[in-house]
């Protein structure tokens, strides 16, 4: 899977599962290319979610929700994930 496919899947799965006002998914893999653990088939992702539904939840609760939505992608394609909520 390439990064553009992964970004589209992430956006769709989150948008289909949670009411979001906006979602931004960024590839940050380039920041880690020289790390010993770097693999071409695993990506470093930053997600920024603006959601009324998640806004009033504790950050750990909101993070668990997103992790459960992206469970397969995290197992297979994501090495590192950062999630920010508005």
Residue ranges and their predicted role:
Residues 1-86:
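N-terminal, polar/charged subdomain of small-to-medium soluble alpha/beta proteins
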């Amino acid at each position: 899977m390439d990064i553009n496919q992964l970004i589209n899947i992430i956006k769709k799965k989150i948008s289909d599962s949670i009411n979001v006002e906006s979602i931004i998914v960024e590839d940050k893999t380039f920041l880690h290319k020289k790390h010993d653990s770097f693999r071409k088939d695993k990506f470093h992702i930053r997600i920024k979610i603006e959601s009324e539904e998640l806004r009033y939840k504790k950050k750990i609760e909101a993070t668990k929700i997103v992790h459960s939505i992206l469970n397969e992608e995290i197992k297979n394609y994501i090495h590192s994930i950062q999630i920010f909520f508005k």
